[in-house]
UniProtKB/Swiss-Prot annotation:
Protein name per the record: B-box domain protein 30
GO cellular component terms, semicolon-separated: nucleus
Subunit and interaction comment: Interacts with CO (via B-box) and with TPL (via PFVFL motif).
Subcellular compartments: Nucleus
InterPro entries: CONSTANS-like_Bbox1 (IPR049808), Znf_B-box (IPR000315)
Gene Ontology BP annotations: circadian rhythm; regulation of flower development
Top-rank lineage group of the source organism: Eukaryota
Gene name for this UniProt entry: MIP1A
Residues involved in Zn(2+) binding: C32, C35, C54, H59
Induction: Circadian-regulation. Peak of expression toward the end of the dark period in both long day and short day photoperiods.
Length: 117
């Protein structure tokens, strides 16, 4: 997973200053599977990399397609970020899964956060 979202927020709050978002090398862009432009999202349900224009076209087709969760691709390292799109333009950031264990005398509680979509 990419740390791009947090770094992007820091960059935007820094008057739009230009800095590297990821420490990994810049890879070749992934192409949109419909038009060949640079892909910006990956739809797991369709198993397709799509540019923003094609993503809007494909996922506005019907109510089932609007439910698809699409992962945003980092512009620097080309990996999938935690930032997702649902529906037309609804942004969601997936939380990191962390396990917190609290051990008491005779029991332990395990808490794992999750997201309903």
């Amino acid at each position: 997973m990419c740390r791009g979202f947090e770094k992007e927020e820091e960059r935007r709050s820094d008057n739009g200053g230009c800095q590297r978002l990821c420490t990994e090398s810049h890879k070749a862009p992934v192409s949109c599977e419909l038009c060949g432009e640079n892909a910006t999202v990956y739809c797991e349900a369709d198993a397709a990399f799509l540019c923003r224009k094609c993503d809007r076209w494909v996922h506005s087709a019907n109510f089932l397609a609007r439910r698809h969760l699409r992962r945003v691709i980092c512009t620097t390292c080309r990996k999938l970020t935690r930032r997702c799109l649902v529906g037309d333009n609804f942004n969601v950031v997936l939380p990191e899964i962390r396990m917190i264990a609290r051990i008491e005398e005779h029991s332990s509680d395990h808490k794992i956060p999750f997201v309903f979509l």
